[in-house]
Amino acid sequence: MTSNRMQTGHPADGVYFGLMSGTSMDGVDGIAVRFEAGKPPAVLSEAFVGFADTLRDALFALQQPGDDEIEREALAANALAARYAVCCHELLRTAGLSPDDVRALGVHGQTVRHRPERGYTRQLNNAALLAELTRIDVIADFRSRDVAAGGQGAPLVPAFHATVFGSPDETRVVCNLGGISNITILPAGGGPQGEGHARNDTVRGHDCGPANALIDAWVERHLKQPFDDGGRFAARGKVDETLLAALLDEPYFRQNAPKSTGRDLFNADWLDAKLAGFQHLAPENVQATLTALTAATVADEIARHAGDCRAVYVCGGGARNPVLLDALATALAARGLDAAVATTAALGVPPQQVESLAFAWLAYRFNARAPGNVSTVTGAAGERVLGALYPR
């Protein structure tokens, strides 16, 4: 096989892998994609590799301070790298590629701490081991440079969203419903820029609040299921408006952008504290209310920052929850917004591919020595090349 590395029109063109393991911590999504200047990304294959319960438990435990953290973190990072490598080998197999055909692998890692106000963010991974196991250049640690430049380090996907989802005719919002919800606002006048030169001066975005982090935690506690399949648990319940008001009484929701958040704030302890005095509620009513919380906080931010938007395109795990999507549409209408809600599949990108595609694209940007952040989104002092290289 002739190496793809010799068949490029731009020095950074070629095949890239992207790996993303989100706050659900259920596994890693991987994608193989070809980037060529002036052309849209071409997906070659995708894969999902789940995490064993032991690894998932270790990752959840590292969300909170505890004993012997350095040892536990190192062992969990090694286990993560091993699962990431399995995903990469599956991508190689299904795409018919060899490691020499891949320019680089962009890997997010697993966030275990995100505290930009203290000047750091920590995405767990052993990138050196991953490079050894795959024999592919690994580009990792994308968030730290933005934080070092005074930014939030999140969200990092808006520049990619602008590249593939922008429109010359309408203002669009891309909403990621992962563990945490975030929005990217793409004003009319943009448009897909195949080589990735997003109009960063007009793009805005930030984290809104909790999404699947709390929804999944509650359904796992009561049904021993990893997520609310189809939103059925929430559909059995009724929103409790008093509890919803208590949940919304959180300073983060009143904070101005740029802002970012994570499980450091929105976790089971936060929820349990808010539920004090609501022990009489049936679990399905709490689930319905958590779903309404996600819809309300996203709709509030869209109404505040993108009142002229006509379409909201959803990606992330929440895109597979029709009850949540209906709640979002209802919440937008209640705030006077005439905005249709659809998934990014309507724009040609399946919602489960968006995040892993974004980190493959960030690896592409690193190789091009081009900025990957949007400083107006993160609050960084300027645009920066993101990531660190671990050669094969």
Curated annotation (Swiss-Prot):
Family classification: Belongs to the anhydro-N-acetylmuramic acid kinase family.
Protein EC: 2.7.1.170
One Gene Ontology molecular-function label: kinase activity
Source taxon at top rank: Bacteria
Positions that bind ATP: 22-29
Catalytic reactions on record: 1,6-anhydro-N-acetyl-beta-muramate + ATP + H2O = N-acetyl-D-muramate 6-phosphate + ADP + H(+)
Function according to Swiss-Prot or TrEMBL: Catalyzes the specific phosphorylation of 1,6-anhydro-N-acetylmuramic acid (anhMurNAc) with the simultaneous cleavage of the 1,6-anhydro ring, generating MurNAc-6-P. Is required for the utilization of anhMurNAc either imported from the medium or derived from its own cell wall murein, and thus plays a role in cell wall recycling.
Keyword Transferase: yes
Pfam families from the UniProt entry: AnmK
Listed InterPro entries: Anhydro_N_Ac-Mur_kinase, ATPase_NBD
The protein's name: Anhydro-N-acetylmuramic acid kinase
Pathway(s) per entry: Amino-sugar metabolism; 1,6-anhydro-N-acetylmuramate degradation; Cell wall biogenesis; peptidoglycan recycling
Keyword Repeat: no
Organism: Burkholderia pseudomallei (strain 1106a)
A GO BP entry: 1,6-anhydro-N-acetyl-beta-muramic acid catabolic process
Keywords of this entry: ATP-binding, Carbohydrate metabolism, Kinase, Nucleotide-binding, Transferase
